[in-house]
C-alpha cells in the first residue's frame, strides 16, 4: 500500500449493497472497496479520520450509477475513434473519449474505461478539503493525487507467477504524473501484442490506460 495509515484503526465492516447492485465495504488499513460488475476499486485516503469518511462517502455516492451510465452509451464507446465521433453524455464516457482522441482507427474509448473510472472517482473525492494523498486503484489502473511535500511509490513486477518486485517508481508532488496503468497479454483484458507487461505513467489514469493498451497491442 503506497500510503501510510496515520495510525487510524478502521474495523472491517460487512458488505453493503445499494439498489442497483453496487456494493461497498471498509477494509482494514483505511481502505474502501467498491465493486459493481467488472468495476472493482480499492481506495486509500491519507488524511484525518473525518476527512477520510467524507471522501469515502463522496466516492460511494458517485460510484453507484457509474456502470449504468456506461452501459447506456456502450455501443458508441465500442466504436473506434474518428474525427466525426458522436457526442457523449456521461462524465466517465467523456474522459474515455478524450483519452483516445487522435488515435483514429487504432482503439475505441473502451481502452480507457478502467482509468477513466479511477480518475472520476478520485476527482469527486478531491472536493473534500483536507486530503493529503489519495489513490484509486481500479484493477491496476491507478489515479492518485498529491499535495505539496508528499510523494508516493508504486511497485512494479513482471510476472504474476513470480510476484517479486522488479522495480519501484517514486512520484512526488512536482511531477505532472497522476495516473499509472499496466497492460499485457497476461492481464485480465484481451491483448493482441507479445508484451508480458507494459506500465505507463501519464497525466491521468485514462491516458495511461489507453497508452498501455496501445503499447501492449503492438
Give the positions of each predicted feature.
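A general secondary-structure signal for short beta-strands and their flanking turns/coil
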Residues: 29, 38-40, 195
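Generic N-terminal amphipathic, Lys/Arg-enriched alpha-helix
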Residues: 36-49
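Conserved mixed alpha/beta catalytic, RNA-binding, or beta-rich assembly cores of soluble enzyme
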Residues: 99, 137-218
Amino acid at each position: 500500500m503506497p500510503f501510510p495509515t496515520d495510525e487510524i484503526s478502521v474495523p472491517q465492516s460487512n458488505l453493503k449493497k445499494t439498489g442497483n447492485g453496487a456494493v461497498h465495504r471498509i477494509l482494514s488499513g483505511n481502505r474502501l472497496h467498491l465493486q459493481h460488475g467488472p468495476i472493482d476499486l480499492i481506495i486509500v485516503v491519507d488524511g484525518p479520520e473525518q476527512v477520510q469518511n467524507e471522501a469515502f462517502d463522496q466516492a460511494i455516492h458517485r460510484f453507484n450509477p457509474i456502470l449504468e451510465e456506461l452501459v447506456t452509451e456502450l455501443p458508441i464507446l465500442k466504436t473506434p475513434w474518428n474525427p466525426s465521433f458522436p457526442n457523449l453524455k456521461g462524465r466517465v464516457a467523456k474522459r474515455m473519449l478524450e483519452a483516445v482522441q487522435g488515435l483514429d482507427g487504432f482503439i475505441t474509448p473502451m481502452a480507457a474505461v478502467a482509468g477513466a473510472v479511477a480518475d472520476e472517482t478520485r476527482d469527486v473525492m478531491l472536493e473534500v478539503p483536507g486530503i493529503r494523498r489519495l489513490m484509486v486503484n481500479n484493477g491496476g489502473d491507478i489515479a492518485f493525487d498529491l499535495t505539496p511535500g508528499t510523494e508516493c511509490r508504486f511497485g512494479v513486477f513482471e510476472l504474476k507467477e513470480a510476484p517479486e518486485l522488479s522495480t519501484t517508481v517514486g512520484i512526488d508532488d512536482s511531477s505532472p504524473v497522476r495516473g499509472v496503468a499496466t497492460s499485457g497479454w497476461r492481464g485480465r483484458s484481451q491483448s493482441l501484442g507479445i508484451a508480458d507487461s507494459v506500465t505507463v505513467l501519464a497525466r491521468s489514469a485514462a491516458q495511461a490506460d489507453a497508452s498501455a493498451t496501445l503499447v501492449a497491442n503492438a
